[in-house]
Each structure stands twice: as C-alpha cells, then as structure tokens.
Amino acid sequence: MINVQAKPAAAASLAAIAIAFLAGCSSTKPVSQDTSPKPATSPAAPVTTAAMADPAADLIGRGCAQYAAQNPTGPGSVAGMAQDPVATAASNNPMLSTLTSALSGKLNPDVNLVDTLNGGEYTVFAPTNAAFDKLPAATIDQLKTDAKLLSSILTYHVIAGQASPSRIDGTHQTLQGADLTVIGARDDLMVNNAGLVCGGVHTANATVYMIDTVLMPPAQ
C-alpha cells in the first residue's frame, strides 16, 4: 500500500486521479499548468443504496466483465476496491499501476497526491496502463521532472463529488480548473476523446471510471 505523505505543493495544487499529455505528441498547444483547485460546476449524485449494498451494481463499460473475471477476489476486485479509499484502491488495481506511480511520488518525487485523494469525495477518470502506453517515452521523462505539469494533468482527471453513471454525462469542472465533457451512455461513454473501459467502480470515497486515453488539460 502506498504510504507516503503528500507534499505541500501538490496538496495545494489540487483537492484531489491519472496523467496526461497525449496531445503533447500531436499538438503544438501548450498544456495548461494552472493547478489551483476550482469548485465543481456540476452537482454529483450520491452513491446509491444499491451500490453500497452491491459494489458491482453501477458497473458500466465493455471491459468490466473481463476485469471482474481476472480479479474475482482480493483487494483488487470490484468488491475489494470498494473497501479502500481511492488512491489505495487504485494501487491494488493491476490495470492502474502506472497511474498509481504517477500520483504516489514514484514517477516524480515532488508530486504525491495520495493523502489528498484519499481524504475527500471524488469522481476519478483513471487512465489504464494501456492508456499510458500510448504516450511517447519522452513525455513520461518530462513528467518525471516537471512537477507543475504532472500535477496539472493529474488533477484534470478528478472532479469533486461522486457522480454515478446516471449523472456523469455533461460538462464538469475539474480540480485542475478546466472543464471536461462526458457524452454518451453506459458502454458508449466518452470522456473528451477517451473511451470508457470500465466505470461506476466504487471505492470508499470515490467513483472511478477507467478510460483508454490520458486526458490533456486545454491550453488557457
């Protein structure tokens, strides 16, 4: 389990997951590095009674069945993740090991968001390992030394409050400050340009949507 303390700069730069600079490979626009937490612009639905009774009740996405089959029990299972706060739950998810490295200080020692993410109520759009594999090695190398950029990217994947699948569509202000847009429904959900792998995954303090692409904060 990750047990490292959030650094003051990182805690101040957000109020809470996943890492992005995909467009850095294909666009000349700079990535926004304003990491001051902003209030959410769209209300988040509370966790349903059914979800609290059955952690799998809200699952959506074509990748959910495969994930559940590969992780039927233990802390990385759907039921197991529901017992832990989100950063801890992500560290137990084999599809989110790269994300865990990014938010826990392993990728960049000046960016550690574990305590922050574990301490509030959030919706997290979590890029899978396969999503990070799309990024060039040079981008990952840059994030190892650019703490401000990494914090901006990570906080762009988080919105305040837990948004259930029935309420997730629409425009949401992220903790990074910029908006992201969720369209579609259930298996066809899109988060900006990212497709849904498996969403509606509950942790003790968050609702997680695993996505297939790392999101990029828009330039400001």
UniProtKB/Swiss-Prot annotation:
A lipid is attached at C25 (N-palmitoyl cysteine). GO terms for molecular function: cell adhesion molecule binding. Could be used in vaccine production; both recombinant protein and DNA vaccines stimulate antigen-specific T cell responses in mice. Induction: Highly expressed and immunogenic during infection of mice with live bacteria (at protein level). Residues 83-215 form the FAS1 domain. It is a lipid-anchor. Its main location: membrane. PROSITE patterns: FAS1, PROKAR_LIPOPROTEIN. It holds the Pfam family Fasciclin. Recombinant, non-modified protein stimulates secretion of cytokines (TNF-alpha, IL-6 and IL-12p40) by mouse macrophage cell lines in a TLR2-dependent fashion, which leads to increased host innate immunity responses against the bacterium. Serves as a strong human and mouse antigen T cell antigen during M.tuberculosis infection, inducing strong IFN-gamma expression. This is Cell surface glycolipoprotein MPT83. It comes from Mycobacterium tuberculosis (strain ATCC 25618 / H37Rv).
